Amino acid sequence: EMTSSLVGSEMCIRDSLQADGNYNWNKQQGQRNFLRLAKERGVNKFLAFLNSPPVYFTQNGLATNTGRGGTLNLKEEHYKNFARFLANVIKGVEKHDGIKFNYLCPFNEPDGHWNWIGPKQEGTPATNREIARAIRLISKEFVNNQIDTQILVNESSDYRCMFDTHMTNWERGYQIQSFFNPDSTATYLGDTPNVPRLMVGHSYWTNTPLNNLHDIRCQLKDTLDKYKVNFWQTETCIMGNDEEIGGGGGYDFTMKTALYVARIIHHDIVYAGARSWQWWRSIGGDYKDGLIREYSDPTFLNGEVKDSKLMWALGNYSRFIRPGAVRKAIIAKDNQGKIIPEGDTDVTGLMCSAYQNTDGKEVFVMINYAAEDKEFTFYQRNGIIKNWKIYRTSDKDGENLLPVGSIKNHEKVVIPARSIITLVTQ
């Protein structure tokens, strides 16, 4: 079993790897049950990540970084064992549970500048060189075991560490350049088997002030494009610096948080070019991180849950924009017909984005951040008249992706104050 000093029972995950090197596949039944339940309900892509190597391999004998700095908590002699462990887990879960992990991210927030010391560690401090060394060994182990799981780098805690440095030194910054510029010979992963030309990162800390929301993502996209690297946003929630909505403390069921998060989604997709967007987390307590608010009894065996407008607002995107969709360009014009620069984004008004799914259906998402109703006329350049069904989420009771009618191209649409609508071709 994994042992980690100071970590409470509700935070501690029991590892299947035992001290004698054998695996006990009866461990982590709760987590594995949820994987199976998800698969039964149609989920067909699974991503695994970890915050620490097994304690038998770590330098301090713990699964936290207590007493250490910003380097990998892994003994020199156990890099290969770590890679072998990951291969065994990927194969073991598929064999015993029928769950194939499509993706593995071995390092979570390796550039984290916040407190890595103590029982609440949720990250894997590591330098770029340590990451590259481990990834190459994991890749080799996967190839030898005919595992086609994709290995992702590197779950950055802050976009600024991906193209620059931010509250850390160069050894844990400039990650895009380090891993995907061939001149970075010590850390280049661009020709490593099982490693896609893809960077993953978290949009924490970069959502305020509003110029950061825009400018940091533009800088990120410029660097990604320079090295021909794709991007996924793989974790975010509300943090202390998100002062516009009161920071992370205290749950919010209303459109205030829902609209704030929708604005982040819009900027991550439109300006950072995110091809996947993921929220932390599905269920939570009195903090702005759960799509659903849980009220557990002291035994954790019973309780109640309540949905939020945040959950439904995420659905304005995820329910209709399906895997494989492509984003389409939007041109906004004023009443005189003049093109508005970046007219698809008014951070205190209307923000819109458009997509085409693999089945040919088109999707248009519009956010109205303003305190008053807005109207616009919607049309397509190709001139094909289509019917669009409208789904709306707002603070009104029952308006949770509620169908509210349909329109045709060239018709005027009114979007109520502080609401989100999704238009889908019929």
Predicted features and spans:
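Noncatalytic carbohydrate-binding groove/subsite architecture in carbohydrate-active enzymes
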Residues: 121-264, 271
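Single conserved hydrophobic/aromatic residue that forms the stacking wall/gate
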Residues: 1-13
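Solvent-exposed beta-hairpin/edge-strand motifs
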Residues: 381-399
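An active-site-proximal structural segment forming one wall of the substrate-binding cleft
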Residues: 19-48, 70-106, 131-142, 169-194
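Carbohydrate-binding surface patches
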Residues: 338-386, 418
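C-terminal beta-strand-rich structural cap/linker in extracellular carbohydrate-active enzymes
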Residues: 404-426
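Aromatic/acidic polysaccharide-binding cleft in carbohydrate-active enzymes
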Residues: 230-321, 325-341
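Structural recognition of the beta-strand scaffold that forms the well-ordered cores
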Residues: 4-5, 45-50, 102-106, 150-153, ...
